[in-house]
Design a protein with these regions (language model features):
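Acidic, glycine-rich active-site loops and adjacent beta-strand->loop/helix elements
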Residues: 33-36, 151
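Hydrophobic residues at beta-strand termini and immediately following loops
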Residues: 1-3, 145
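Hydrophobic helical membrane-anchoring modules
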Residues: 93-96, 119-187
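Active-site loop/turn elements of alpha/beta-hydrolase fold enzymes
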Residues: 33, 62, 147
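An aromatic- and histidine-rich active-site surface loop
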Residues: 35, 44, 129-130
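Acceptor/aglycone-binding surface of glycosyltransferases and processive sugar-polymer synthases
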Residues: 3-22, 27, 39-125, 152-161, ...
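Residue-level signature of catalytic and energy-coupling elements of molecular machines
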Residues: 16, 34, 109, 135, ...
Length: 187
C-alpha cells in the first residue's frame, strides 16, 4: 500500500517494522526497490535470524566474499571504494567487523525490537546506520550473508550528502560508545 505522504527511507522501514510487530510476526524483511537486490536471498536472511534471539538482524553483503558480489553485478568503482572506506571507518571506531554497512537487504528479528526505541531513529537514509549502532549498544548481533547485486544506469544524487552524514554519525556513535556524550534515543 502506497503512503499518502513520503515518510522517508527510515520512516518507511519504521512503518514496516511497526506493522509487523502489530501483526505479531516473527521477522520482517526490507529490500530496496531499485532492483539491485535479488529477493531469492530472503529465505537465507530469515534462516540466519530464526531461533536465535541474540541476533537482531541479518544483512546481505556484497563484500563478504571480497568484491566479486559487487563488481560482477556492475557496482561502480567509486561506490565500491566509498562503501569500503565508510564501512572501515565504522568498524575501526566501533570495533566491529562488518563488510557492507550500506546494503539494501535486511532481515529483522522482531523479538529484539519489542522493547527498542527504533521509532526515535532518523526517517532519513542513515536509518540503517543508527539501527546498526543501536544493536551494538544492546549487544545484539547483526549477521551478514554473501549476495550479489545488479546495477543499472541509474544515478543517485545523495552519495556525497549520505557519506558526510554517515561519517558524522559514526563519529557521534563513537563518542556515545565511549560515554563522552549521551543521547537517549539509542537506549
Amino acid at each position: 500500500k502506497e503512503n499518502k505522504k513520503n515518510l522517508g527511507y527510515g520512516g518507511n522501514i519504521k512503518k514496516c517494522l511497526n506493522f509487523s510487530l502489530k501483526k505479531k510476526f516473527d521477522y520482517a524483511v526490507m529490500i530496496h526497490g531499485d532492483g539491485q537486490y535479488d529477493p531469492k536471498h530472503i529465505p537465507s536472511l530469515v534462516k540466519e535470524i530464526s531461533g536465535d534471539n541474540t541476533i537482531g538482524a541479518c544483512t546481505g553483503s556484497r563484500l563478504l566474499d571480497g568484491t566479486k558480489g559487487a563488481t560482477k553485478g556492475g557496482m561502480p568503482y567509486y561506490k565500491l571504494l566509498g562503501n569500503i572506506l565508510l564501512t572501515s571507518i565504522f568498524n575501526f571506531l566501533l570495533k566491529t567487523k562488518y563488510t557492507d554497512a550500506h546494503t539494501g537487504l535486511w532481515g529483522y528479528n522482531l523479538y529484539n525490537l519489542k522493547n527498542r526505541k527504533f521509532n526515535f531513529l532518523t526517517n532519513g537514509y542513515n536509518f540503517d546506520n543508527e539501527f546498526r549502532f543501536m544493536n551494538i549498544l544492546k549487544k545484539t548481533l547483526i549477521k551478514e550473508i554473501p549476495i550479489k547485486a545488479r546495477y543499472g544506469d541509474e544515478r543517485s544524487q545523495l552519495h556525497i550528502k549520505y557519506a558526510i552524514t554517515f561519517f558524522i554519525n559514526t563519529i557521534l556513535f563513537f563518542l556515545i560508545d565511549k560515554k563522552i556524550i549521551k543521547i537517549n534515543k539509542f537506549k
